[in-house]
Regions:
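Surface-exposed, interaction-prone regions used to assemble/regulate multi-protein complexes
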Residues: 1-142
């Protein structure tokens, strides 16, 4: 899979924040979309466990969200993503619990995870240039 473009699918209030902080780590309430040179897409978002009692970062060839995003922001040229664009990428989980997903290519990486701003959380996807540092693991079943 060769990465062609990267999009943040956003709510309008998230777009306002990103406009003021372009290139920074982001916390997305909706999802991330990777588009490949062969036309395929990979969506990355929060998902509940099969029993509805756990959460994790998940990726799939289909959208996790109903309806179109309020804002569709192309972030391919941002410093986090530009080293990956045009390269074959791999997606793999880091650690246990599918809480951190690494997107890697040619010595560069971006991380999608459940940890941001000092706490484990859900309903947002943190996207950044390094894996999270945290004080505690998320509680099972929460």
């Amino acid at each position: 899979m060769v990465l062609a473009r990267v999009y943040y699918e956003l709510f309008s209030h998230e777009a306002e924040w990103l406009d003021a902080h372009s290139g920074a780590d982001a916390e997305l309430g909706r999802q991330l979309r990777l588009e490949m040179t062969d036309g395929s897409r990979v969506f990355i978002a929060w998902a509940w466990g099969a029993d509805g009692d756990g959460y994790h970062v998940e990726f799939a060839p289909h959208s996790f969200c109903a309806g179109a995003p309020e804002v569709d922001r192309d972030v391919s040229a941002w410093p986090l993503w530009s080293p990956l664009v045009g390269q074959p990428v791999t997606l793999s989980y880091v650690g246990e619990g599918q809480q951190v997903l690494a997107i890697r290519a040619a010595g560069a990486a971006a991380y999608c995870c459940s940890f941001g701003r000092g706490v484990w959380g859900m309903d947002e996807l943190r996207v950044g240039d390094r894996p999270p540092q945290h004080d505690r693991e998320p509680a099972r079943g929460t």
